[in-house]
UniProtKB/Swiss-Prot annotation:
Subcellular localization, as worded in the UniProt entry: Cytoplasm
GO CC aspect terms: cytoplasm
Biological source species: Caenorhabditis elegans
Keyword Transcription regulation: no
Protein name: Protein-lysine N-methyltransferase M142.8
GO biological process, one term: methylation
């Protein structure tokens, strides 16, 4: 009896199904890289709930205005922390197209690394200090949307924000209204009048907080 006799062998049907699955996954990767796939589906296991388009555009408009206000340095740097769907809308702005702003996405979901390879940094809030040294204290504006409504998640995300932001960084935080006390104590933030909305009508009461006087929110 050979050493391989006890090793389970996959049936021909199983091998064919596995091969088909791998081919489909590779096709999706190639479509993401080529831009054929415009929208990445939510992964609820990662607590992903995408904004509706109006919310995305309003957050982007505020981020651009805040980044360019009071600073002549160009490009102004904007960081998106766990808010990947905003990237597409930043790309549509004239300020991005003309090089007035520079964008970096800090995100756990590597699918966005395929879609936005030059602007993507893999980020896990559980390891808040695992950040590229060259990006520390570089950002004028940070827009963050921690994936979970939990104190630990917000505390660690806030730690990352403090490391990434300049001393006068402007921060927009989108999270559940129940996190208001933590937002205030951790980053001296106040609730704005803007209420983010999600494409799939997330049931939680959601709010936008800022550590500065916002420019475009009524």
């Amino acid at each position: 009896m050979s050493d391989t006799d006890d090793i389970p062998q996959l049936s021909a049907d199983t091998l064919a199904a596995l091969s088909m699955f791998q081919a489909e996954q590779q096709e999706k990767i190639e479509q993401l890289q080529s831009g054929i796939i415009e929208k990445i589906d939510e992964d609820w296991q990662l607590s992903q709930f995408w904004y509706d388009d109006e919310t995305s555009r309003k957050l982007v408009a505020e981020g651009v205005a805040a980044a360019l206000e009071g600073s002549e340095a160009r490009p102004a740097r904007i960081g998106c922390v766990s808010s990947p769907t905003l990237v597409k809308f930043f790309h549509e702005t004239e300020e991005y197209k003309t090089g007035q702003i520079q964008l970096t996405l800090f995100e756990f979901d590597d699918r966005f690394g395929l879609k936005f390879p030059t602007e993507f940094v893999h980020y896990d809030y559980k390891h808040p200090t695992d950040l590229p040294a060259e990006l520390l204290a570089k950002f004028d504006v940070i827009i963050a949307d921690p994936p979970f409504l939990a104190a630990e998640c917000l505390i660690k995300t806030a730690h990352s924000i403090r490391l990434l932001g300049k001393s006068d960084v402007k921060v927009l935080l989108c999270t559940g209204a129940i996190m208001e006390d933590y937002a205030s104590r951790l980053m001296a933030m106040h609730r704005t009048s803007f209420e983010p909305r999600h494409a799939n009508n997330l049931a939680n009461d959601f709010s936008c907080f800022a550590n500065y006087q916002t420019l475009t929110f009524c």
